[in-house]
Curated annotation (Swiss-Prot):
Gene3D superfamilies recorded: Glycogen Phosphorylase B
Key words, A-Z: Cell cycle, Cell division, Cell inner membrane, Cell membrane, Cell shape, Cell wall biogenesis/degradation, Glycosyltransferase, Membrane, Peptidoglycan synthesis, Transferase
Subcellular location(s) of the protein: Cell inner membrane
Enzyme Commission no: 2.4.1.227
Protein's organism: Pseudomonas putida (strain GB-1)
Entry-linked InterPro entries: GlcNAc_MurG, Glyco_trans_28_C, GlycoTrans_28_N
Biological processes per GO annotation: carbohydrate metabolic process; cell division; cell wall organization; lipid glycosylation; peptidoglycan biosynthetic process; regulation of cell shape
A molecular function (GO) term: undecaprenyldiphospho-muramoylpentapeptide beta-N-acetylglucosaminyltransferase activity
Gene from which this protein is expressed: murG
Name the UniProt record assigns to this protein: UDP-N-acetylglucosamine--N-acetylmuramyl-(pentapeptide) pyrophosphoryl-undecaprenol N-acetylglucosamine transferase
Amino acid sequence: MAADGKNVLIMAGGTGGHVFPALACAREFQARGYSVHWLGTPRGIENELVPQAGLPLHLIQVSGLRGKGKLSLLKAPFTLIKAVLQARRIIRQLKPVCVLGFGGYVTGPGGVAARLCGVPLVIHEQNARAGTANRLLVPLSARVCEAFPNTFEASDKRRTTGNPVRPELFMDAQRAPLAERRARLLVLGGSLGAEPLNKLLPKALSEVPAGLRPEVFHQAGKQHAPITAERYHEAGVAAQVEPFIKDMAQAYGWADMVVCRAGALTVSELAAAGLPSMLVPLPHAIDDHQTHNAQYLAREGAAFLMPQATTGAAQLAERLNEVLMQPEKLNVMAGTARRLAKPAATSTVVDICLEVAHG
């Protein structure tokens, strides 16, 4: 444990969308001489990623309430009280100078416990529409960080910081001019794949004239990669299909444009990499937050928002033809995306935490 006044507690759990930006901030805290501890839950991805990062992980018992049965709802108040008490015990033991929450089920009880212990609480919202826990914690927070403008109501607590993303994504890729080569299309569905995109892209690309058709690199997910490769073969479209892309910075550096979902980190990474995109938001995302994320890039002209319900192969092919026949349009979109990036997001969030911690 670090010396008094040098501990920080980060709360993030459940999915990579919460955990990865929190890990970026953890590394920044460590670079400034702070000892970082992590508060999570037993079932989230943090149980794999946080120990890999060499950070101590503290667990509390809490889970979501959406879609649960009546018995779970009746037990909920007692479960939450127990989780708050568990978090309070951990905070009292660690004596952190501040608590930084990134969302997930752990953030609610942890945020309440921070307030009960008199430790400054800072929350960070990755999506353009705030999650339930972060919305409820605003009154208890010393500062409220948002990745996208106007996610929270205007107040002296609010700071628009952007999403912490990997610094290597901000490197300028050296690409030959599009006039001298075929365009390159990167298709992403998340680490598990997005089956609607896996079905849509081969059909859409088969409707693009062969002379205009881009090179294709498609992340299809472990379970769907073989059938996706077969779909491309049957459609007569050459494509490299992989279950998972380990080096996203390299993939972004290769691509000229991207077709993908609109998770908060993906949208922020597209801006960091300066990549035009066609965004197909996950239609059943909680509070439709992916559509709101996509609108951030689409409103400024850095992306096309293409709702899944109204986007078939013909519609996607038409959009692809439009940009492939106008390489200068891709260049303009790329520049717009890069201007929307927030390269200082990680250091800004950490600055805010230390400001409230030390005055």
